[in-house]
Amino acid sequence: MKPNTFGFIILLCIILLAGFGNAFAQALDISSGGAPTITGSVGGSVTGSSNVLNDLVVTINFGEVSPSNTNGIVKVVVPIAIRSNQQYKVQALVTGGSNVNAQALQRTDVGLGFNNFHAMGAKSRVCVNPHIIYAPFSNDPSGNVTINASGRATYPSTLNNAIVATTILSGPRLSNGGSSRATNDGYIFDAIFALTPQFFANGTTSATITLTISAGPTSSC
């Protein structure tokens, strides 16, 4: 049997909701948290800035995800930096990525989790109250793969868990910094994507994930 071919492309971008003008980036901010990485791919790639002062715009191409990719899983890690001078929340919204053919790759076939939340440096604000990654996203989907009764790989959380604007993270103030982005004035966390190569109906599809940071629930420092 000839293996089929299926590609999946994800665009990760941001929207900032923090006011207007220069203050817009000061109060609530998302940027690159470092260089994104991809492992286990055949013909895949991930592009994005490694500079934490640059905007977060990442394109993920999982490449070949049929059984002709003999790696156990394709994993992508995207570091994301966030800054705020107030309590905040981060929401994710996924658009696209669905197929009419149930045998084609679907949003539920792409694991999505968030973890590795840590301070950037000396100007990161340390608070008593915790920063919370919300269920079901607090996991590394590449290490939590199961095969269901139909033989399809499943994950604790997937792209399908964010097809409406969904809060993934919230907490108290993040930064002690000044009026502009710095390399040490916030926190970084990882967005982790996972896709298990298997038989899918032929084709290529794409999805876009938009991350939005805005004022969050009351969470004193």
Predicted regions and their residues:
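N-terminal compositionally biased, intrinsically disordered segments and leader/signal-like regions
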Residues: 6, 71, 109, 159, ...
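Bacterial N-terminal signal peptides
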Residues: 9-19
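Local beta-strand/beta-hairpin segments that build beta-sheet-rich folds
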Residues: 75, 146-148, 152-181
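Bacterial N-terminal signal peptides that target proteins for export
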Residues: 1-10
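Low-complexity, serine/threonine/proline-enriched polar segments
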Residues: 117-161
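N-terminal small/polar-rich segments of proteins
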Residues: 24-136, 171-221
